[in-house]
Amino acid sequence: MNLPNLSLADFLPLLPAIIMVVGASILLLSEVFLSTTASRAYQAVLTVVTAVAAGAMALTTMFEPPQEVMLGFGVMDPFSSFLTFVVCVGLGLATLSSVSFLRKRGAERGEFYALMLFASAGMSLLAMSNELITLFVNIEVLSLSTYALTSYLRRGTRPSEAGFKYFILGAFSSAVLLYGAALLYGATGTTHLTAMAGPLSTAMSSQPGLVYAGIILVITGFAFKVAAVPFHMWTPDVYEGAPTPVTALMSVGVKAAAFAAMVRVFFMVGKGVDPQMLLGLFSVLAFLTMVAGNLLAIPQRNVKRMLAYSSIAHAGYLLVGVAALFVTGPGEQFRLLGASALTGGTPLGLARAEALRGILYYLLAYTFSAVGAFAIVSVLERREDEEKGTAWDLERFSGLAQRKPGWAFAMAAFMLSLGGIPPTIGFMSKLLIFQAAVDAGLIGLTIVGVLSSAVGIYYYLRVVVYMFMRPVPEGAQALEKSWSTELALVLSTAAVVILGIIPGPIMGWLEQASSIFGQ
């Protein structure tokens, strides 16, 4: 039997994920030696250091030429490196916000941070996946970790209920995705994405039904992971029931990894099938997700559920960018939702690169804004009110500007960014997405996106009004200081404001990460 010939060079591109797995293993071993609350603080420090090291390692590979690793089952390129960096940013900020959250509940244990690292390693590997079975395995690595994290808190029924719902629906969606992958394998005879285009083109002539069924099932599986309508039903309950720092990591990390895998899979698949079908499917998903997410968020007084529906809406904006990847160039006419020919003679490769650049920038912007917002939510909630469902009521934010001006300013920045209001990073990210859609000729979809974004501003500004224009509630308890949470807020707020005003520092990274579509 011939064994695969693996060398050290095959593992070097995997260093970010390896660093996270090693860090998680050290945390699990540390449980044997650490027993006091003070000593457990070092577990959070180790997690943050691991996230920084993995993120820095990902950045060092940003400008390396693309190369297949692990016998072609993965690919290291600027695209996967940037997504790994985004995941590490979300991991580090979510870890900082979890320290005081866990301490107040007496739940500081090494396995919490270890699961965060295992989930993030799965996200990183998912962004690199270049083969369908490897992709499925990495989805399960991150999913199993997030299932456990969702039900981590053992007091009350909400975490257990949320974890159970997430597990059942997540397992169902994984089965759907795997079935779709099996159909694509049956049509092409390969599971490697880079080798799939030619056989798919042939299969479209002989057995188109099999190909279409496989594509639709794979899209359905991904749609669940990114919380796209109508596969979003799990999101509000799971986001509400999970520990708030876990909700923060899920909302940004899972979304980033799933979109990375979705883009890579369908960029390769799109070379062998009619791109008009993919354009139509993703346009419909984007339309439904933007509209439903924003409309369902309006009546919410539970801020955690409001942010959950907001997350759905943001998935819709990202799907606009995904749809723009499948406009095939001048002379093609797509009328769905107002799509027309590629405008202005924009070169096809440039149009796709613009769309991908918008997606990547949006994921980074959403990471800083959403994790920061959930960090504020985590420090305002009280453990005794969680089971009653009042821990995340909008009234918690009343008079926050008088009690904690710094926190109120940070939350206002996050809300403005999520709403896409200048001069925040959220405005720049939406501008890039919608500009790419306009350049691709998706005029109707862009109009729907802009109008949906305008609707979303209402419920974001409502939080700001409560913080700055409502009095402090009678009997309001003093708010505890948390150095780790405040550090996360400072970093997130600085990124939201500075990168909104001066986006130049990361534009070089975005240009490099989107270059795989510039050919």
Curated annotation (Swiss-Prot):
Organism, as annotated: Myxococcus xanthus (strain DK1622)
Domain of life: Bacteria
GO cellular component: plasma membrane
Family according to the record: Belongs to the complex I subunit 2 family.
Reaction(s) the record says it catalyses: a quinone + NADH + 5 H(+)(in) = a quinol + NAD(+) + 4 H(+)(out)
Classification via InterPro entries: NADH-Q_OxRdtase_suN/2 (IPR010096), ND/Mrp_TM (IPR001750)
Main location: membrane
Subunit composition and interactions: NDH-1 is composed of 14 different subunits. Subunits NuoA, H, J, K, L, M, N constitute the membrane sector of the complex.
Annotated protein name in UniProt: NADH-quinone oxidoreductase subunit N
Keywords, ordered alphabetically: Cell inner membrane, Cell membrane, Membrane, NAD, Quinone, Translocase, Transmembrane, Transmembrane helix, Transport, Ubiquinone
Transmembrane segments: 14-34, 44-64, 82-102, 117-137, 167-187, 209-229, 249-269, 278-298, 307-327, 359-379, 407-427, 431-451, 487-507
